[in-house]
Amino acid sequence: MKKVMVVAACLALVAGAVYARKLNKEQKRLETCGVVMQEVLNIPDNIPHELLEKSECVIVIPSVRKLAFGIGASYGRGAMVCRKGAKFNGSWGAPAMYALEGGSLGFQIGGEATDLILLVMNDRGMESILSSKVKLGADASIAGGPKGRDASADTDAWMRAEILSYSRSRGLFAGVSLEGSTLRPDDEASEQVYGRSIKAKDIVRSEKMGVPATGRHFVNVLQKSAPRNESEQASNQ
């Protein structure tokens, strides 16, 4: 019996290793988005639950870095998950890959990687992001999101913003600004995840798009934390 258990355990380890080797870099990146989202939600006084409930989409860009030492411009890739339905008021759907380029995180991140989390709060912000690449602060309004108990104090600020931004850094950190950055669909990365050519808007708009295995953790984390859209806009639709 012990031999059988040992053999079974070995086979499980081998299967896991084979699975890991087969994942391409974009599939691994999508898995990382789920891990980052879970870790961020575990931080005390971070993203207020009421804001996550009212969001239509969540974008996670892990490990954003400066392009070069002394240059503010940054680059990162990640994924966006939106609620299903024409008005984005259903359960969380399949992920689409996105890229963040340009702009400046300044000296706030130094040489360290920074994880970014963006909440898309209304239809205007969502339509802008789905249409094409968006310059944050110009094509879509963006503001640093309130944390924990600060949510009520900053109500006016986040109600006006189409996108709220949060960050987590493993090194010294003094805040983050995403104005001037460009957010765009990364359709080539989505193709690597889904195994076929597909655009971000088609992924998000589809009611029947299946969630790839590497994206299930990301979707499940959001579904468990904020299963329903509790915004006034959604409740009136």
Regions found by a protein language model. Give the residues of each.
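Sec/Tat signal peptide C-region and signal peptidase I cleavage site
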Residues: 15-21
